[in-house]
């Protein structure tokens, strides 16, 4: 049996209480109005490409931008919105979702992250992103 570190334990605990989405499910939910929020770094996005229609929000300000009661919220942050977080591989997005859910936001993330998104043949593009720092 492989040793699981503390962060692995935390990750497992963080995923309790919501249903994670496949890339295809996330893409469908985005088309139906959910906010797809990309938390990858600039370097990761330069390597993998940008996700069409995704909002890019740095992990360090994520909660402030998405909390509808925050003075620093983005215009899309409204009560009842659904957020789908996505990162490179689907790990840090789960921790972000736990934090968002803890402040009352309906959030989930994408199993396998952008790597799975690309593997499933979903679109990425090169060029400008919708950054909300």
Please place each PLM-identified region on the residue numbering.
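Rhodanese-like catalytic fold shared by cysteine-dependent sulfurtransferases
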Residues: 1-35, 42-82, 91-133
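Short, surface-exposed ligand- or partner-binding patches at beta-edge/loop junctions that are enriched
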Residues: 85-86
């Amino acid at each position: 049996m492989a040793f699981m570190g503390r962060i692995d334990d935390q990750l497992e605990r963080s995923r309790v209480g919501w249903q994670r989405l496949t890339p295809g499910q996330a893409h469908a939910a985005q088309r139906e109005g959910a906010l797809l929020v990309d938390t990858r770094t600039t370097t990761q996005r330069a390597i993998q490409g940008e996700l069409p229609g995704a909002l890019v929000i740095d992990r360090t300000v994520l909660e402030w931008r998405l909390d509808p009661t925050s003075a620093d919220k983005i215009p899309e942050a409204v009560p009842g919105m659904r957020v789908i977080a996505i990162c490179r591989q689907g790990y840090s997005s789960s921790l972000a979702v736990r934090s968002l859910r803890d402040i009352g936001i309906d959030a989930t993330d994408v199993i396998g992250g952008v790597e799975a998104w690309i593997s499933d043949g979903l679109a990425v593009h090169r060029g400008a992103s919708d950054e909300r720092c």
